[in-house]
Amino acid sequence: MKRSKTLRAADAKVDREKLYAPLEAVRLAKETSTTKFDATVEVAFRLGVDPRKADQMVRGTVNLPHGTGKTARVLVFATGDRAAAAEAAGADIVGDDELINEIAKGNRLNEFDAVVATPDLMGKVGRLGRVLGPRGLMPNPKTGTVTMDVAKAVTDIKGGKIEFRVDKHSNLHFIIGKVSFSDEQLVENYAAALDEIVRLKPSAAKGRYIKKAALSTTMGPGIQLDSNRTRNLLVEEDPAAV
């Protein structure tokens, strides 16, 4: 009952009819965070695209300037010097045929958050699509995860580079940090994600592109964002600055 009252009190602070400026939303999200741990801050977008059509797929990567607050665990499929370079760059798991077989059997799937592969191994890694695909972990040249420069890929991912892909319901989800981040850090991470989504707008997409955006913390209420606001995001309420 006590927990329920806490959640209801947090929910009551959010105006469901209002579209909040990003800075105001971040401050409200922190105020309404109810967890005792350092909660994750997430943004969800609803896009005006049909992901069933190849020319309306939205997929890419973005380097969050302040990271997500969590260091990603990276698995790399590589051999020889490339494998050594991946290990030196901080890859958590490195291997080739034996590792591919392990993953194919569904083993170790909870030990990594991102996957990188060299092009020469993609013929073998390709058969992992059934296992990695549904988890959004399949290496892809378009996102820089199929590359000979595995060291750079590992460094980028651990430095805050995240991969995203619109789901079948036309939604995109981003973790933009932790409640412990400063307001400015969270807004700047949000801005980086928003800029990349706007940049990747498919030419085939008609009508309003970003239909809805909402920010929330772990177990916190959803806060509707003014998705038309794409500039001067660190200004809270000055309409002239929008």
From Swiss-Prot:
**Coiled coil (residue ranges):** none
Q: Which Pfam families match?
A: Ribosomal_L1
Q: Which UniProt keywords apply?
A: Repressor, Ribonucleoprotein, Ribosomal protein, RNA-binding, rRNA-binding, Translation regulation, tRNA-binding
Q: Which GO terms describe its biological process?
A: regulation of translation; translation
InterPro entries documented for this protein: Ribosom_uL1_bac-type (IPR005878), Ribosomal_uL1 (IPR002143), Ribosomal_uL1-like (IPR023674), Ribosomal_uL1/biogenesis (IPR028364), Ribosomal_uL1_3-a/b-sand (IPR016095), Ribosomal_uL1_CS (IPR023673)
Name the GO cellular-component terms. large ribosomal subunit
Q: Does the keyword Lipoprotein apply?
A: no
Single GO MF annotation: tRNA binding
Does the record bear RNA-binding in its keywords? yes
PROSITE patterns hit by this protein: RIBOSOMAL_L1
Which branch of life, at top level? Bacteria
HAMAP family the UniProt entry points to: Ribosomal_uL1_B (MF_01318_B)
What interactions and quaternary structure are annotated?
Part of the 50S ribosomal subunit.
* Entry similarity comment: Belongs to the universal ribosomal protein uL1 family.
Q: What does this protein do?
A: Binds directly to 23S rRNA. The L1 stalk is quite mobile in the ribosome, and is involved in E site tRNA release.
Protein's UniProt name: Large ribosomal subunit protein uL1
Q: Which organism is it from?
A: Streptomyces sp. (strain FRI-5)
